[in-house]
Amino acid sequence: MGQKINPIGLRLGINRTWDSRWFAGKNEYGKLLHEDVKIREILHKELKQAAVARIVIERPHKKCRVTIHSARPGVVIGKKGADIDKLRKKVADITSSDVVINIVEIRKPELDATLVAESIAQQLERRVAFRRAMKRAVQSAMRLGAEGIRINCSGRLGGAEIARMEWYREGRVPLHTLRADIDYGVATAFTTFGTCGVKVWIFKGEILEHDPMAQDKRMAEGDGGGSSRPRRDAA
């Protein structure tokens, strides 16, 4: 089962927590969930070049707090904070409430599965050899402290007539071990031959304590490729 299921979903409530953190009654739940989907769609569309790995949405009383995890916070903020103010207004139009946007810098993008997958997809679109792109990503992750990494690429790789899947793995990636801190990311490369899918699993070590916030705490300490210091509060 661990081989098939999304590793993040399998570990929710054990050593991972949800990206949407709020409670709503029966009548409000659908509306707020739809707002979350819209917010993420708009932010990913507006911040294509900002290397956004994760968007966390929290809803304290009559407010909406959005935390953007990005490897390029300067692109998100813009000149003198102009871009982040525009984003705050767009999110406020969706939620009809006060919006606070925080930026969290990812110090080691090579250890973030989503950013690694997007990087490989972009290289495939630029016609870089898929084996070279995969090997380079594996070497970078292992050099920066990952205990294991696995990368799958599928589709008409290299313009082949028949679609196939190629994968590389180095180190350990224990998908069945619930205490394992495994990051997972997916991206799609739109090439002239069709679409190619990229999947990345990165094993960063084991979390022995039962703590849903453990992964966030490790990112805050800089151990998981992130830093929780907000670069700007747009409230």
Curated annotation (Swiss-Prot):
PROSITE patterns: KH_TYPE_2, RIBOSOMAL_S3. GO terms for cellular component: cytosolic small ribosomal subunit. Residues 215-235 are annotated as: Disordered. One of its GO terms (molecular function) is structural constituent of ribosome. SUPFAM superfamilies: Prokaryotic type KH domain (KH-domain type II), Ribosomal protein S3 C-terminal domain. Transmembrane segments: none annotated. InterPro entries: KH_dom, KH_dom-like_a/b, KH_dom_type_2, KH_sf_prok-type, Ribosomal_S3_C_sf, Ribosomal_uS3_bac-typ, Ribosomal_uS3_C, Ribosomal_uS3_CS. Keywords: Ribonucleoprotein, Ribosomal protein, RNA-binding, rRNA-binding. Pfam families: KH_2, Ribosomal_S3_C. GO terms for biological process: translation. Residues 39-107 form the KH type-2 domain. Binds the lower part of the 30S subunit head. Binds mRNA in the 70S ribosome, positioning it for translation. Part of the 30S ribosomal subunit. Forms a tight complex with proteins S10 and S14. Belongs to the universal ribosomal protein uS3 family. This is Small ribosomal subunit protein uS3.
